[in-house]
Structures are given as structure tokens and as C-alpha cells.
């Protein structure tokens, strides 16, 4: 299953202009390409390295973010160190504003501090993991309840789960 459609619908409904979807590293290019396609947005990629565990360094942006609204998309936000560095890199490259989206908000350790330092307008996540107390105001949580309900109903009624996702439940 994927929350891609919940997240992209949310961003479509926001009506943001001049969007560029930004992959935080090479491992997320396919996900971000699909996300960008659903929004009719451009795609940019960050060159990220991890010199040590929980340490992210981003060298440069591949693609044009100048004057655009960037949406950084990942599957998980854990300590938010990658998100903080990615946001700063994209803003330094001239992005007008930065948003972020992820399915799973682990948000461990100093994640809330990293988010506060990231300069992100809004972080959109799903309710697959409850947020701990003190979550920043710029985090928006979307429900996966309908997606799960429809998937379970399809399984028990012997219908295709792929239909719940319009036949696009495979990202790769």
C-alpha cells in the first residue's frame, strides 16, 4: 500500500504554484518522480552523503528550484536532520518556499528542534505513527483510515486491492 495518493491530493488541494518536487537523495528519485508526475511539477534531486550515522550532508541541487515552491518528499522522517539540511540547501538555491511530505512521522530524538530550524512552511505526514507531545504547529497529519478501510474491504470481498489505488499501488 502507499499513501502517495493521499499526500498528492492534499498538495493539489493547496493550489500551490510553480512547484518542484525534491528528492532528498538518489534512493527516493522514483517516489519523487511519481509524486511530481501526479502534481504536474518539475523534479529536482539532492546529492546527499552520510559521513556518519544520523548525519546528512548535501552537496548540491540537481535541477532548478530558483523562485519555485519546493516539496521535499520522503518515506520516513526520523530525526529530521536530512529534512533540515535539505530544506536549507533548497532555500539557499533560491526556492521561494519549502514544504515536506512523508508517510511515516517517526520524529525521534531532536526531530522537533531540527524541524524548527528547517524553515519549512508545512510538513504533511500521515497517521501511521502518532506524534509525541509538543509537535510543531507546522506539521499536518492526514488520516489513512479510508485507505485502510477500502483495502481491507477489498480483501474480504475478494476484490482487487489495486482498484483502491486506481491500479497504481506499485511505486516501482
Enumerate the language-model features and the residues they cover.
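PRPP-associated nucleotide enzymes
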Residues: 1-172
